[in-house]
């Protein structure tokens, strides 16, 4: 029988795949989409911040340039050796610085003069040199340097968006940075992974403003999110597997019940009708199984009954074919004895009546071996009357063997065959030996008659396999066919014979079925 995988397992896998895999795909697609949207938003934000910062710095630069242009003539009338003019110059520059949103420091240097608003003496090397201008004063020409320490917009971008600003020259030397990871004066080397940046030109000196974002921090947050989602996914997998298994059990319970009923029906142990727990179209199959089982049982019982009747008919037919020639000969003997010896004729009639009563008994096809032997003794006694006591019957049997049950008329044909075909001498000795071995009764019938030639022996052996109704030789053929009907192929009959040396018939009868009325 082919081994099948339970349908419940296949359904469980299908349910599991149809629930967990879509969730897994949704999570993956969601993560990829989230990452793509995040990158897009960050790029857009950086672009916006670059534009805003560029505009703010250009506005500051324009205001400074406008201030210097407007006050250029005024500066030429001031003498920075004069204390009053120095104060006026400081006041004007401070006004310019305070009007700008950026944190600016100026340095005005000339011959023996240095003016600045860097009262805290901050290191201007860490500041961006925003612009330089030459200013002509009355006493001399001075150099004005304006440094940018920070701008509110860049600080706001750094605080709110974690985006940092760099200003580099045309050789990528860092001129300004509000991130401690970069040092002013070093080369700017953009990272290949984990950074997003955008740059824009600031001035004619090819200085560039770079706004960049370090996404490693977000990646760490993303990893944490991934771990959380992985845990959730594992829990979903476990929950999905348990749910799929329970659902598969519920959905296939009726199918498994039907399969079990089919198995019981094959072994003829189905029992009475029981409906399925769930009212579904499977109930049609359930009803059909019971209807088919009942029809099959009725058919089996009908076949068994027909076979029993056929065996009974065959057995009766065989038993009837044993009788005619014997009855005819016996009746002639009785007719002869009535005149010569009425008393002996009466004895023969009594023996014949007992034999007929035995052979015509219809309530059972099995008898004790002892009854069969009594029948044989009566049969031989009648035959001895016909043949002047020339037949000597010897029975060798244990008491246990005599009480075994065998089919009726299973031994008589052997004696009949010995008398019919072995009688050609003044005396015919027939020996019946009965032994028990391995649940079998072994019967040996030996006579000292004329025996058979090799060709005749071969013919008799072959005739045993002919159909009982197709042969004219009824003796051993009838017995063999009767044994095959009653005991099956377990019964064995072997014939051995030599010309003028007698005949030996070995017969094995299974006792395991002997007690059954077949």
From Swiss-Prot:
The gene is hptS. Residues 297-513 form the Histidine kinase domain. It comes from Staphylococcus aureus (strain MSSA476). It is a multi-pass membrane protein. InterPro entries: Bact_2-comp_sensor_kinase (IPR050640), HATPase_C_sf (IPR036890), Sig_transdc_His_kin_internal (IPR010559). It is found in: Cell membrane. The chain crosses the membrane at residues 20-40, 222-242. It is an enzyme of class 2 (transferase). The keyword Transmembrane helix applies. One of its GO terms (molecular function) is phosphorelay sensor kinase activity. PANTHER family: SENSOR HISTIDINE KINASE YPDA, SENSOR PROTEIN KINASE HPTS. Keywords: ATP-binding, Cell membrane, Kinase, Membrane, Nucleotide-binding, Phosphoprotein, Transferase, Transmembrane, Transmembrane helix, Two-component regulatory system. Autophosphorylated. This is Sensor protein kinase HptS. The keyword Transcription does not apply. The modification Phosphohistidine is found at residue 325. Member of the two-component regulatory system HptS/HptR that regulates genes involved in hexose phosphate transport system in response to changes in extracellular phosphate sources. May act as a sensor protein kinase which is autophosphorylated at a histidine residue and transfers its phosphate group to the conserved aspartic acid residue in the regulatory domain of HptS. In turn, HptS antagonizes CcpA-dependent transcription of a subset of CcpA-regulated genes involved in antibiotic susceptibility. It catalyses: ATP + protein L-histidine = ADP + protein N-phospho-L-histidine. GO terms for cellular component: plasma membrane. Its EC number is 2.7.13.3.
